[in-house]
Amino acid sequence: MEKREITGVQGQVNNIEVIFKEYYGSLCYFASRFLKDEEVIEDLVQDVFIALLEKKMLFQSEVHLKNFLYLSIRNSCLNYIRNT
């Protein structure tokens, strides 16, 4: 099984741009089920991608990555609702 590495260090595999383009729209749509403010939604989705880049995570498969992204944005939305 091929692992997908997410890093921001030059000279290493850097798939974050591809992943961002692939999932940004669907994550924003998913977040809109919880929140109505588009600016907040975009900020939360971007924060998830920043966390992904900063943590330099390694995923077993595309499914694991997708699950991480959707769970992260769900939790971010719920935290936002709880704190406002």
Question: Would you name each region that the model predicts?
Answer:
Residues 29, 43-50, 63-75:
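Structural recognition of an alpha-helix C-terminal capping motif at a helix-to-coil junction
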Residues 6-29, 33, 53:
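A short, charge-rich alpha-helical start-of-domain segment used by transcription regulators
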Residues 20, 38-55:
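Conserved RNAP core-binding helix
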Residues 9, 49-64, 83-84:
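Sigma70-family region 2
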Residues 2, 19, 76-77:
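Bacterial Sec-dependent N-terminal signal peptides
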Residues 14, 18, 22, 39, ...:
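Residues at secondary-structure transition points
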Residues 74-84:
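Arg/Lys-rich amphipathic alpha helix in sigma70-family domain 2
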